[in-house]
Amino acid sequence: YLGEKLAEQKADVRVLVNNAGCGTTGNIGFGATSADVMRVVDLNVRALTMVTQTVIPFMTRGAKIINVSSIAAFCPTPRMTVYSASKAYVSAFTGGIADELRPKGISVTAVCPGPMKTEFFDAAGDHDLFGNIPWCDPVKVVAGTIRAAKKGRTFYTPTVFNKFYRFVAKILPMKWMIKATRV
């Protein structure tokens, strides 16, 4: 349907922001329901992929795609396993299509914020899980993401804490990171 509408209008999409997402807390197999798990995969992975694939043919040089990922992409997060896996997909997908679209002059940026006070957390529940992690200011995240996209950066991680987390996740054994991120 989206592709048909874009074709009808002879659209020239300048910016695509894949911001829809959801998460759930709870252990997979018990705690998180199958419906919750599939909702996360369907929205965070399948919908993002299909919307992107549908819109790309309607983009020209100078267009930008912004995908909302998360610091959860850097390391598996117990009790948010499916969410962190879905965001790892978003980051990997972004890196891959950024390279594929670069010759066409289309830039792709993944923003990887930490927790933010948005409607996302009302739906995900378990707000206390993130009590010790510095929260991101949504307005600052958006401003930084726009700057990063304009510069053609493939990844943008706001705040010093989140940048440090990304760095540590790259150098420490995954087993240690999983233990540290157990929420």
Predicted regions and their residues:
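Conserved hydrophobic beta-strands of the Rossmann-like cofactor-binding core
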Residues: 13-17
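Active-site helix of classical SDR
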Residues: 52, 86
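Residue(s) in the substrate-gating loop at a strand-loop-helix junction
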Residues: 70
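Conserved amphipathic alpha-helix within the SDR
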Residues: 1-12
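SDR active-site lid
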Residues: 98-162
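Active-site loop-to-helix junction immediately N-terminal to the catalytic Tyr of the SDR YXXXK motif
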Residues: 76-84, 96
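Conserved mid-core segment of classical short-chain dehydrogenase/reductases
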Residues: 23-38, 79
